[in-house]
Amino acid sequence: MSQYLSGNYYCLTDKGKVRKINEDYANALINPFGNVLLMVADGMGGAQKGEVASKNLVKYITSEFLSLEKEFKNEKAMSKWVYKVVKEANSKIYLKANSDEKFKGMGTTLSLVLLVKDKLLTAQIGDSRVYLLIDNNLTQITEDQTYVNYLIKSKGMPKEIANTHPKRHELTNALGTKSRVNLDINIRDYHNERILICSDGLYNNVPESDLASIIRGNDSLDKKANQLIAFGNFNGGSDNMALILWESEN
């Protein structure tokens, strides 16, 4: 199934203008088989707990990805591997949080993309997001696992009200906070769309129309990434921000 994917990526995180610690973590890499892995994790728990959770999660999956000894044969193999490594990472973080008082309550979101040939897998926990640029429109392809999104989906709450709801940042799912992981995995055909993965600190401070305008542009990826972070800080920088940009050359 595997075929070497050619493209460029850029990762960037920033603590913003309010938080003292950056609890967001991101990584992007290509393994020897030409598979692409992109991850953004937004830690939570405060007092450096979230920083440990997000960093440990991304580093563990990175290590497992680089240790792969064979190619993914099909979509089932992709899903099985992602579920396995995320489950293992969850167990490690949960154990650490429950065996060491200083890490009690830590957890993290995860938005992961695995590209294998013409297939794009997303794995989602929490409220970080994956966007694709489809027909010049920025389209969110993951679903926020938040209380307000639950209200929108099940109770018909208007998005305008949800945007100012006092519980709009409350997660309904996080990694490391429970012994069992609840992972949302989806696979779709990949047609070389541009990809943006980001934490809520970015999309809450930069309107989607502006995200799209920058992603559409022809600047280098590092310039786009820095523009996005600068935009977020200009609009208040109320939270840590993490992002990954990917542009295919296939």
Where are these regions (language model features)?
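PP2C/PPM-type serine/threonine phosphatase catalytic domain
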Residues: 1-250
